[in-house]
Amino acid sequence: MSLPNSSCLLEDKMCEGNKTTMASPQLMPLVVVLSTICLVTVGLNLLVLYAVRSERKLHTVGNLYIVSLSVADLIVGAVVMPMNILYLLMSKWSLGRPLCLFWLSMDYVASTASIFSVFILCIDRYRSVQQPLRYLKYRTKTRASATILGAWFLSFLWVIPILGWNHFMQQTSVRREDKCETDFYDVTWFKVMTAIINFYLPTLLMLWFYAKIYKAVRQHCQHRELINGSLPSFSEIKLRPENPKGDAKKPGKESPWEVLKRKPKDAGGGSVLKSPSQTXKEMKSPVVFSQEDDREVDKLHCFPLDIVPMQTAAEGSSRDYVAVNQSHGQLKTDEQGLNTHGASEISEDQMLGDSQSFSRTDSDTTTETAPGKGKLRSGSNTGLDYIKFTWKRLRSHSRQYVSGLHMNRERKAAKQLGFIMAAFILCWIPYFIFFMVIAFCKNCCNEHLHMFTIWLGYINSTLNPLIYPLCNENFKKTFKRILHIRS
């Protein structure tokens, strides 16, 4: 049986070398292998789409690009591969010109959409790593969907030359009815130009983006290691009372945590004077703030305040006044410290909400002393300033912690992108190198090698859904749940 030439992304039957024959017993094992690859491709990509649809943890902006890539791969496995196998079994194309144009259109569109989906996924990862918190505000499902639609729109532009090349170029090419090929199959300049736009240029840009991603993640890891070498991590923060021995520190030599727990003495220019004729009534202060639903900060308590009845000379009347008891002026926390349990499982949408809550803090508030009321305002502002001071510090470190969590997630996402790009380049580069050779040397064609490079590009659609669970724990758990696989 004659082995026909196969359709491909940017070339249709350009390989015009000597025909080789293959007996049916020799051809059937190849057909079985290719059919198995086709079925596996369809099954795995359907599994990815069902997993994203059924698991809420996978409803993230980043996975929209994965869905786009999976849809393109599904078209390759469900339409392009089977018709290529059918064409392989036939000695000539006998299914008619309309079905041929449909197959060619799906081949070009799906393969290009797969390439562009990897490209926009790479851009998304690049921006997430370079500007994590700023890009999170921009990174919405609406914008991601618009980007994906743009990529598919560009891919569908292939339909124009496939269906109307002779009409627009006003040239008539010799068309063989027993072959399924485009009207521009012998136009070298057009095929080289589209190869550069469809593959070489996106690939070079992706390599540049990924180099930047790798550099940014590496620098971030080195920066965090440097910080962790001198400061405790956010999950280890536990505010402790003042050192009873009162070890003296030189100005400017205090660590940030010592500044955080330091009492702002004399912040208002004086200390609180209690009335000698009255006894201070101590009571435990209520909770300053409680974030029961927050996954990073569980519950923080303020220090105890004293309700001190005071009488001032200026007013001549007594009233209750909130003052700081210096003997209880430390910040108390829960025995478990700051609860960070479950922070690693925060979804991207939750991370977006949390990161937006950590807004830029205002500058520290200074106090002014009025004549006759200086000591009274001093005590009040000391307590309030200490609360504000501590809260601003906690929000500042919480912001850094959220940024750190985001970078850890992006490091894993960058790893996933690295595997996807490696599979993409390894699968497609042999075909495009071979294509550039035969584009200028039509006699330099080995028919079996040509077919091998075509199917190697198709196999990229089979490998992509295998990469997701290897690099994403949520995909892995969802796949096991759907397939009823017990760990």
UniProtKB/Swiss-Prot annotation:
GO cellular component terms attached to this protein's record: dendrite; plasma membrane; synapse
Disordered: region residues: 238-292, 345-379
UniProt modification remark: Phosphorylation at sites in the second and third cytoplasmic loops independently contribute to agonist-induced receptor down-regulation.
Glycosylation sites: 5, 18
Modified residues (Phosphoserine): 230, 344, 347, 380, 396, 398
Biological process per Gene Ontology, one example term: positive regulation of vasoconstriction
Stretches of the chain forming a coiled coil according to its record: none
Cited PANTHER family: 5-HYDROXYTRYPTAMINE RECEPTOR, HISTAMINE H1 RECEPTOR
Domain remark in the UniProt entry: Histamine activates the receptor by forming hydrogen bonds with transmembrane domains 3 and 6, squashing the ligand-binding pocket on the extracellular side and opening the cavity for G-protein engagement on the intracellular side.
Role: G-protein-coupled receptor for histamine, a biogenic amine that functions as an immune modulator and a neurotransmitter. Through the H1 receptor, histamine mediates the contraction of smooth muscles and increases capillary permeability due to contraction of terminal venules. Also mediates neurotransmission in the central nervous system and thereby regulates circadian rhythms, emotional and locomotor activities as well as cognitive functions.
Protein name: Histamine H1 receptor
Organism: Pan troglodytes
Name of encoding gene: HRH1
